[in-house]
C-alpha cells in the first residue's frame, strides 16, 4: 500500500510539471505568432530580412550652379588657388574665364555665378574691354561675386588712399574705399543677425584683410549689409539685386587663411579661412534672386 501511494505521488508530481511546461510553451508560441519574441535580445538574430534602422545625418544643400572663375589679367594667383580649392572641396562645377571671354562671350551660357577674385582692380579696368557684357550677364539673371579687387571693380567710384577714380562697370552705385587696415590684418567682423543664414554663425567673426574696400555712399534701402568692420562700423560685405540677377561684394577674404609670423597666405581652408560661411553666403545669394 505504501509503495502504491509513493508511485501515485510521483505520477502526480510529473503531471503537474508536464502541465506547467505545456502552459509555458503555449505562451511562447502565442508570442511568436504575434511577432513578439520572448527575449528582445534575440530579435532579428535569426531573421536576415530584418535590418536595423540607421539614422543618417541630413546632407547640406548642394550649390548646384556653375561658377565662372575669372583668371585673366589682374587676378591674384594665390587667391585663384584658394578659390579653386574651395570650389573643388564643395563639389561646385566651375569654368575658367579670361579677359577675352568675359568681354565677348555669352556669359549666361557659360556660368550662373561670375567670380572676380582679389588682385588689381586697375588691371580689370584696363584689360576687360567690354564691361557692359558683365552688366548684361547680371541683368539677365546671373550672379556676380567680387572679392577685394573684384569688389572695387564693381563700384562706380573706387577710392584708394584718398584718391577717387571713376570705374565703368557700375554694378554698385556707391564708393569702395580703402585701405583702412594694415595688409595682412585679422579683421574683426560683425555679422548682421537679420540675414537668414547668419543664424548658423556667431554674431562676431574674424576674416583676413588684404586691402579690400568698405562700402559707402549708397541707398541703404536697396542694399543688404551682411557684415560690418568692427574697426569703423562701415559695410564690409554687401549684396543687392541688379536686374534679374544678384551681386555680392566682399572687402575681406573669407576664402583665405594667413600665418602672420611667416607672412604666408593659406589656400587650403586653414589658417582662419571661413569656407563654411562663404559657402552659406553663396547658397543664400542664389536663393535671394528676384523672381
Locate predicted features:
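Class I SAM-dependent methyltransferase SAM-binding "motif I" and its flanking Rossmann-like core
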Residues: 155-201
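Hydrophobic single-pass membrane-insertion segments
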Residues: 22-35
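Mature N-terminal, pre-catalytic/accessory segment of carbohydrate-active enzymes
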Residues: 19-24, 47-70, 76, 85-88
